[in-house]
UniProtKB/Swiss-Prot annotation:
<comment type="similarity">
    <text>Belongs to the enolase family.</text>
</comment>
<feature type="binding site">
    <location>
        <position position="392"/>
    </location>
    <ligand>
        <name>(2R)-2-phosphoglycerate</name>
    </ligand>
</feature>
<dbReference type="InterPro" id="IPR020810">
    <property type="entry name" value="Enolase_C"/>
</dbReference>
<feature type="binding site">
    <location>
        <position position="341"/>
    </location>
    <ligand>
        <name>(2R)-2-phosphoglycerate</name>
    </ligand>
</feature>
<comment type="function">
    <text>Catalyzes the reversible conversion of 2-phosphoglycerate (2-PG) into phosphoenolpyruvate (PEP). It is essential for the degradation of carbohydrates via glycolysis.</text>
</comment>
<feature type="binding site">
    <location>
        <position position="289"/>
    </location>
    <ligand>
        <name>Mg(2+)</name>
    </ligand>
</feature>
<feature type="binding site">
    <location>
        <position position="243"/>
    </location>
    <ligand>
        <name>Mg(2+)</name>
    </ligand>
</feature>
<dbReference type="InterPro" id="IPR020811">
    <property type="entry name" value="Enolase_N"/>
</dbReference>
<dbReference type="GO" id="GO:0006096">
    <property type="term" value="P:glycolytic process"/>
</dbReference>
<dbReference type="InterPro" id="IPR036849">
    <property type="entry name" value="Enolase-like_C_sf"/>
</dbReference>
<feature type="binding site">
    <location>
        <position position="371"/>
    </location>
    <ligand>
        <name>(2R)-2-phosphoglycerate</name>
    </ligand>
</feature>
<feature type="binding site">
    <location>
        <position position="164"/>
    </location>
    <ligand>
        <name>(2R)-2-phosphoglycerate</name>
    </ligand>
</feature>
<dbReference type="Pfam" id="PF03952">
    <property type="entry name" value="Enolase_N"/>
</dbReference>
<keyword id="KW-0479">Metal-binding</keyword>
<feature type="active site" description="Proton donor">
    <location>
        <position position="206"/>
    </location>
</feature>
<keyword id="KW-0456">Lyase</keyword>
<comment type="pathway">
    <text>Carbohydrate degradation; glycolysis; pyruvate from D-glyceraldehyde 3-phosphate: step 4/5.</text>
</comment>
């Protein structure tokens, strides 16, 4: 039989930020090859799986991944060679067993994930299926509503905007292709507005603009202006989604949120909740990710009680795609959505488990990229396979982001009349009071 793993190769390649990352090839007995590369994040949750870096400052500023690659070649490969590539759960469990740590610090989540994803791609190719068909079977027909990053701030840029991502969601589109067209039109319109006001139109890590705006509010106002000027209605055709990444603003000693890029103002948890409540009243915001810090569970509970019935509240640093943290959130009634980043947890099997838990609890799930990406488009197939209905994969520029959108356009075409785009109906976790 040709579906057993014959050989696993691994190499160090470069991501979209110019940092090394891991790429793996899983080769089956019949010569079928699956290849996958892993991403990395700029703002990382304290509880997420460990990305193994070499730490040798004289090589790639300490960011080399040769240790992770050696772990694939010397520890993972000898154990997986001969196993069936068609049994993803067994492959992933074997790697978790070999690592034996809660955060995958022994082998590195970057080593484990590269092999996990490459195995799925090899298995799909062996069976003559697309990756989304293999992972999602007959249910894989929902195209996601995209969260398109158009203004960057915080750790993703060098400006005076505190919040990391300002995004648009084309909730009024009828198809995924139309959603991308609408987003592109707003992106280019925004570029023209920024240019006209004398702002720079250079882009950040994820392809959004990073102008030196005067305030956080100005970012929202610029986006609303761009939506209208492009011919769309804010809140109806296109809504705003935010990722303020407030863990980056939180001081655990003082338990205050410091708006360090703009006013230097210090806010208590209660004041931060009020801040977001006012923004939701003022702007057409449909989703806020990491509106409170990952350590501030009480603040998260207050935020959820205050506005969780109005908008989607996404836990990223809070949950780190981990079922134990998600379970705690569900029990406490904290957030109503989880961000799914495969490299935060480290295997496809655990990713599927997290999405299943979220859906059972009535939480939405959003498949996400990282700020350090590659040309790998696995998450585009994954979001269709999981049927989460939402994807966050950057702006409408930079090939590392566009590659995922283009793959989804191809998938929509392949699905023909069975393709579904749910638009504003993806927000089933918003419990109206």
């Amino acid at each position: 039989m040709g579906f057993h793993i014959y050989e696993i190769k691994a190499r160090q390649i470069i991501d979209s930020r110019g940092n090394p990352t891991v790429e793996a090839d899983v080769i089956l007995e019949d010569g079928t090859c699956g290849r996958s590369a892993v991403p990395s994040g700029a703002s990382t949750g304290i509880n997420e799986a460990v990305e193994l870096r070499d730490g040798d400052k004289s090589v790639y500023m300490g960011k080399g991944v040769l240790k992770a690659i050696e772990n694939i070649k010397n520890i993972i490969a000898p154990e997986l060679e001969g196993m069936s590539a068609l049994n993803q759960v067994a492959i992933d469990r074997k790697m978790l067993e070999l690592d034996g740590t809660p955060t995958k610090e022994k082998l590195g989540a970057n080593a484990i994930l590269a092999v996990s994803m490459a195995t799925a791609k090899a298995a799909a190719k062996y069976l003559g299926l697309k990756v989304y068909q293999y992972l999602g079977a007959y249910k894989a027909n929902i195209l996601p509503t995209p969260m398109c990053n158009i203004i960057n701030g915080g750790a993703h840029s060098d400006n005076s905007v505190d919040f990391q991502e300002f995004m648009i969601m084309p909730i009024g589109a009828k198809t995924f292709s139309e959603a991308i067209r609408m987003s592109v039109e707003v992106f280019h319109t925004l570029k023209g507005i920024l240019h006209g006001k004398g702002y720079a139109t250079s882009v950040g890590d994820e392809g959004g603009f990073a102008p030196n705006l005067k305030s956080n509010e100005e970012a929202c106002e610029m986006i609303i202006e761009a939506i209208k000027k492009a011919g769309y209605e804010p809140g109806k055709d296109i809504a705003i989604a935010l990722d303020p990444a407030t863990s980056e603003l939180y001081d655990p000693k003082t338990k205050k949120y410091v708006l360090k890029w703009s006013t230097k103002e210090e806010l208590t948890s209660e004041q931060m909740v009020e801040y977001w409540s006012k923004w939701v009243e003022k702007y057409p915001i449909i989703s806020i990710e990491d509106g409170m810090a990952e350590e501030d569970w009480d603040g998260w509970k207050k935020l959820t009680d205050k506005i969780g019935h109005k908008i989607q509240l996404v836990g990223d640093d809070l949950f780190v795609t981990n079922t134990s943290f998600l379970k705690k959130g569900i029990e406490m009634g904290v957030a109503n959505s989880i961000l799914i980043k495969v490299n935060q947890i480290g295997t496809l099997t655990e990713t599927f488990e997290a999405v299943e838990m979220a859906k059972k609890a009535g939480y939405t799930a959003i498949v996400s990229h990282r700020s350090g990406e590659t040309e790998d488009t696995t998450i585009a197939d994954l979001v269709v396979a999981l049927g989460t209905g939402q994807i966050k994969t950057g702006s409408l520029s930079r090939t590392d982001r566009i590659a995922k959108y283009n793959q989804l356009i191809r998938i929509e075409e392949e699905l023909e009349t069975t393709a579904e785009y749910h638009g504003k109906n993806v927000f089933y976790s918003i419990k109206q009071k």
